Design a protein with these regions (language model features):
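Short acidic-hydrophobic, aromatic-tinged amphipathic segments that line or gate anion-handling sites
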Residues: 43-49, 121-125, 156
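Short, charged, surface-exposed secondary-structure boundary motifs
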Residues: 38-41, 55, 98-104, 215-217
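General beta-strand structural signal in soluble alpha/beta enzymes
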Residues: 5, 30-31, 67-68, 89-92, ...
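ATP-binding N-terminal substructure of ATP-dependent carboxylate-amine bond-forming enzymes
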Residues: 1-95
Length: 230
């Protein structure tokens, strides 16, 4: 079968290589792909935010299954759009994508279902931030609510820094965020666990640790990811 792979990062290159191991796969079309995917698949220059054009290309190249890598098209509802048009697609729908697309949504979900999570406060103005700071201790964790290309989390040592960063977010530093989530700081190592789920079943896909700081030795601001191991 023909596979359509949405995305242009290293993640999509890795997915492309793995998908090609299947005997069921005839060809992979990457939208838009990158230099790595160009060596093992066919890159299609396409704007992945243009859902109508993606649908047109999927039909043009007789693609049997679409796999979506990046968070943004998931959060904006590409799965819902393709599914509505009878295209088979792998990825969470718009509602489920809020787990990644909104930290506030995720924290509320944890609270509702008694899932352990750091203490937090969702803030949309300076006064709410100040109120949180009056009852918390350094270091402080501040997170932009929406997608921020992996750069939306900062660990602050001072209240002044928290106020500065929160105001930048309120003023539109990250276009998808107009709220911040303030959290208590938890000391330890971070890890990600991956599962594929449907309405009745789940399958564990393994775990990994992502290293996001820009500098050697885990220093500097966060990035979308400097490397990971599993």
């Amino acid at each position: 079968m023909n596979i359509g792979l949405i995305g242009s990062g290293g993640r999509e290159h890795a997915l492309c290589e793995k998908i090609l191991e299947s005997r069921l796969v005839k060809k992979i079309f990457c939208f838009p792909g990158n230099a790595g995917t160009a060596e093992i698949a066919q890159n299609i220059n396409a704007d992945i935010s243009n859902f109508k054009n993606i649908l047109k290309l999927v039909r043009l190249y007789n693609i049997n299954l679409v796999i979506i890598g990046p968070e943004e098209p998931l959060v904006k509802g590409l799965v819902d759009y393709l599914t509505k048009n009878k295209i088979k697609v792998f990825g969470p729908n718009k509602f489920a994508s809020q787990l990644e697309g909104s930290k506030a949504f995720m924290k509320k979900l944890c609270l509702k279902h008694n899932i352990p999570t750091a203490k937090f406060k969702i803030c949309s103005n300076k006064n709410q931030v100040l109120n949180f700071l009056n009852y918390s201790f350094s270091p402080y964790v501040i997170k932009a609510d929406g997608l921020a290309a992996g750069k939306g989390v900062t660990i602050c040592k001072t209240k002044k820094q928290v106020l500065k960063i929160s105001q930048e977010i309120f003023k539109g530093k990250f276009k998808s965020s107009n709220k911040v989530v303030l959290e208590e700081f938890l000391n330890g190592e971070e890890a990600s666990y991956f599962l594929v789920v449907d309405k009745k079943n789940f399958k564990f896909f393994g775990s990994a640790q992502d290293h996001k700081r820009v500098g050697e030795g885990d220093v500097g601001p966060n990035t979308g990811g400097m490397g990971a191991y599993s």
